[in-house]
Amino acid sequence: MFADLDYDIEEDKLGIPTVPGKVTLQKDAQNLIGISIGGGAQYCPCLYIVQVFDNTPAALDGTVAAGDEITGVNGKSIKGKTKVEVAKMIQEVKGEVTIHYNKLQADPKQGMSLDIVLKKVKHRLVENMSSGTADALGLSRAILCNDGLVKRLEELERTAELYKGMTEHTKNLLRAFYELSQTHRAFGDVFSVIGVREPQPAASEAFVKFADAHRSIEKFGIRLLKTIKPMLTDLNTYLNKAIPDTRLTIKKYLDVKFEYLSYCLKVKEMDDEEYSCIGPRRALYRVSTGNYEYRLILRCRQEARARFSQMRKDVLEKMELLDQKHVQDIVFQLQRFVSTMSKYYNDCYAVLQDADVFPIEVDLAHTTLAYGPNQGSFTDGEEEDEEEEDGAAREVSKDACGATGPTDKGGSWCDS
């Protein structure tokens, strides 16, 4: 097709400049340099690198990248050749091979089109859908298989809930212990006052000793609060700083992941479009003019994949460190909590054992309860009122008899 035109078709570079160069690569044990080639006769006037594979001579050298045009192999021009012929030329060379290329000076922002943005949005929506739901809605699930970071994110959320519950429980427990210590202090103050006012020395000493025991328990409670309170600070640091920072990193990773998947999907669509036009033997305009749009997307995909791989590595390292900190920190915090509580109860038990002062003998005042012949019987107020009423009635009857005079034996009144 291009032989008839002698390759004088003007390339549509989309304003993307190219810089010529050459690189010498040492082949690996499989006699490969680690690149895949696209384009070439008979539909495209140039050959270009589609992908640079990881951990290969081309990838380790880093000179050539996806989208770069290949112009020659070991000083021989490849103009008008197919990609299969160029691949054979590279394979025939043993040891070192020199690749002549035109470096594509592409700006990744040029590849971030509206189509890529919409694909990222679709991937975000489909990410949390099940396969059945996505198929019912006619959406393809272009996701990475065995992406363990999604499960790690769920584990992180469960860990955050665990720490949140521990923090709330510890706050309530410390508040209860503070109120309990204040109650012990009030007990100590009350028994101290009783001991000071008690006239009997033995009883006074017993009350004071019991009061000191409660005051000591109050001090033990304050010491417990001071020991466990830093536990809240550590838990809050993990909950409010470490976990949100890791969650933000995972969100950035997901954004890079969706961008990479969007470019992969775009490349797949452009490949399908190109293959569909091969059958009728008519080339696409972008293919016949150098396929620069496709090469730009290839470069963007490669750079997005590099960012994705680096971000994934960083997230895995951060998650690993966070898991180690979680295991070590939770063990340390629980050990500190248990040891502090154990010391508190042991100290309280020892203090109360020393303050075993009951029963206490107390002499009550003589005015309260008195026994003896000189003391009258105890009467309450109701009996005194009844006696007063009976005395008043007898006095009234005597007065009546004195006013009317005496009576005779028959019971009749007689005048004096």
UniProtKB/Swiss-Prot annotation:
UniProt biased composition (Acidic residues): 380-390
Keywords: Actin-binding, Calcium, Cytoplasm, Cytoskeleton, Lipoprotein, Membrane, Metal-binding, Palmitate, Phosphoprotein, Synapse, Synaptosome, Zinc
The PDZ domain, residue ranges: 22-105
Lipid anchor positions (S-palmitoyl cysteine): 414
Annotated AH domain residues: 144-357
Binding residues for Zn(2+): 44, 46
Membrane topology classification: Peripheral membrane protein; Lipid-anchor
Keyword Metal-binding: yes
Region annotation (Disordered) ranges: 373-416
Modification Phosphothreonine, positions: 82
PTM annotation: Phosphorylation at Thr-82 appears to inhibit the interaction with AMPA receptors. Phosphorylated on tyrosine residues by EPHB2 and on serine or threonine residues by PKC.
Subunit composition and interactions: Monomer and homodimer. Interacts with CXADR. Interacts presynaptically with the glutamate receptors GRIA2, GRIA3, GRIK3, isoform 3 of GRIA4, isoform A of GRM4, GRM7 and GRM8; with NAPA and NAPB; and with BTG2. The interaction with NAPA and NAPB disrupts the interaction with GRIA2, conducting to the internalization of GRIA2.
Domain notes: The AH domain mediates binding to F-actin. The unoccupied PDZ domain is probably involved in allosteric modulation by forming an intramolecular bridge with the AH domain leading to a 'closed' formation. Binding of a PDZ ligand, such as GRIA2, allows enhanced interactions with F-actin and the Arp2/3 complex thus enhanced inhibition of actin polymerization.
Cited function: Probable adapter protein that bind to and organize the subcellular localization of a variety of membrane proteins containing some PDZ recognition sequence. Involved in the clustering of various receptors, possibly by acting at the receptor internalization level. Plays a role in synaptic plasticity by regulating the trafficking and internalization of AMPA receptors. May be regulated upon PRKCA activation. May regulate ASIC1/ASIC3 channel.
Name of the protein this chain belongs to: PRKCA-binding protein
Organism of this sequence: Mus musculus
Protein encoded by which gene: Pick1
